[in-house]
């Protein structure tokens, strides 16, 4: 059992990505690299660094972002990525996981005697990470573009 654990929520978007979320995805890539290095640096002190990889979780970030996408992209070449103003956003989160799913995984990681390096949980996390790992980049790009816009 380690003396302590540092747990970081990274989001699947650190490995998978969506158009118009470059600002968010880049921060998750940075957290991924930093966590990997930190894990090596603090292991000697008995500290485990654990990364939580949430899938699609019911939060307000999508609605919040959509306001800005529409405002700043509606007359640009990028408008096809956020949809038309008539597109309904009501059912977007129906199949997303509740945040409690991630809280339970964090609890599991903190209380594990020998925690895994990474835990994934939530809607689409497993499938996105698996697809990202097995598909060539251009195929995955095409999949993302077909799904998002």
Where are these regions (language model features)?
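Active-site loop immediately N-terminal to the catalytic Tyr-X3-Lys motif
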Residues: 16-23
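Active-site segment of SDR-like NAD(P)-dependent oxidoreductases
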Residues: 10-16, 55-56
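Non-catalytic terminal and boundary segments that flank Rossmann-like NAD(P)-dependent oxidoreductase
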Residues: 138-149
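Active-site helix of classical SDR
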Residues: 27-30
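Core catalytic loop region at the nicotinamide-binding pocket of NAD(P)H-dependent oxidoreductases
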Residues: 49, 87-133
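Short, small-residue-biased leader/transition segments that mark boundaries at the very start
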Residues: 1-8
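Active-site-adjacent segment of SDR/Rossmann-fold oxidoreductases
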Residues: 16, 37-47
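C-terminal beta-strand-loop-alpha-helix "lid" module of Rossmann-like NAD(P)-dependent dehydrogenases
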Residues: 44-93
């Amino acid at each position: 059992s380690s003396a302590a654990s540092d747990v970081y929520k990274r989001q699947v978007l650190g490995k998978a990505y969506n158009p118009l979320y470059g600002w968010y995805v880049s921060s998750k890539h940075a957290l991924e690299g930093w966590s990997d290095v930190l894990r090596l640096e603090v292991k000697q002190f008995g500290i485990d660094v654990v990364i939580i990889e949430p899938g699609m979780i019911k939060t307000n970030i999508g609605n919040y972002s959509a306001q800005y996408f529409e405002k700043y992209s509606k007359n640009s070449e990028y408008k096809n990525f956020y949809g038309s103003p008539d597109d309904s956003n009501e059912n977007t989160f129906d199949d997303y996981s509740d945040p409690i799913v991630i809280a339970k995984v964090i609890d599991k990681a903190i209380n594990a005697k020998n925690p895994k390096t990474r835990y994934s949980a939530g809607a689409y996390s497993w499938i996105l990470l698996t697809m990202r790992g097995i598909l060539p980049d251009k195929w995955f790009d095409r999949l993302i573009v077909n799904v998002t816009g």
